[in-house]
């Protein structure tokens, strides 16, 4: 069972709530995914108050845990301010911490991320840092107080899967006891299954579901892929070989 900061969940699929064609399609996708955690972005604009109220009513009706994020923040100060606002609005110490360093790739700023994580952890937040796949950055985030890490597979929304599978595999081996969630870049269910087969604890999906032709069907496909990948990992799969190995025994073979 998945566990974050002492809370346990049956599903290992986290779902983002942005970019869906309509609220009803979002709701259908969340239900189809079987996800028990959704990420939400705090809207700092106050213009569409009614739309915001309707959105939160929908999320509450789904009965899922909410993981607010600091999407769009480019400095530690901005991210920290947004985290405080999110705690006030959502009544949770959870925060998915994003400090973006590059506007083209949306690659996280590792220095600003560690700085913000240290401050927020000291203030009692339970931080889920969106990070690259660098082991040293991971070490610094753990030292700062993070008990979950969320390395990217590829740039946000790219659908490329894993740019560096070796780095992700190495991170899993290096931190066997830290919950690891692949966040960003996953495009199709096979990517999610591959992440789970590597031993990752969960995956976070947004664009791949929200922008699909049938979001609910895609959400269901991801749910099945995550379950299959986890079962495969727990089943201890065989090692890849360079040479063939006969699956049919020679015992009893007729020799002519």
UniProtKB/Swiss-Prot annotation:
Pfam family, one: ThiG
GO molecular function: thiazole synthase activity
Active site: 96
CC annotations in GO: cytoplasm
A GO biological process held by the record: thiamine diphosphate biosynthetic process
Chief place of localization: cytoplasm
Domain of life from the UniProt record: Bacteria
Class of the enzyme per the UniProt entry, highest EC level: transferase
Transferase among keywords: yes
Entries under Gene3D superfamilies matching the protein: Aldolase class I
Keywords: Cytoplasm, Schiff base, Thiamine biosynthesis, Transferase
Binding site for 1-deoxy-D-xylulose 5-phosphate: 157, 184-185, 206-207
Catalytic reaction(s) noted: [ThiS sulfur-carrier protein]-C-terminal-Gly-aminoethanethioate + 2-iminoacetate + 1-deoxy-D-xylulose 5-phosphate = [ThiS sulfur-carrier protein]-C-terminal Gly-Gly + 2-[(2R,5Z)-2-carboxy-4-methylthiazol-5(2H)-ylidene]ethyl phosphate + 2 H2O + H(+)
Involved pathway(s): Cofactor biosynthesis; thiamine diphosphate biosynthesis
Entry EC no(s): 2.8.1.10
Location in the cell: Cytoplasm
Record-stated family: Belongs to the ThiG family.
Role noted for this protein: Catalyzes the rearrangement of 1-deoxy-D-xylulose 5-phosphate (DXP) to produce the thiazole phosphate moiety of thiamine. Sulfur is provided by the thiocarboxylate moiety of the carrier protein ThiS. In vitro, sulfur can be provided by H(2)S.
Binding partners and assembly: Homotetramer. Forms heterodimers with either ThiH or ThiS.
UniProt name for this protein: Thiazole synthase
Organism: Brucella melitensis biotype 2 (strain ATCC 23457)
Lineage: Bacteria, Pseudomonadati, Pseudomonadota, Alphaproteobacteria, Hyphomicrobiales
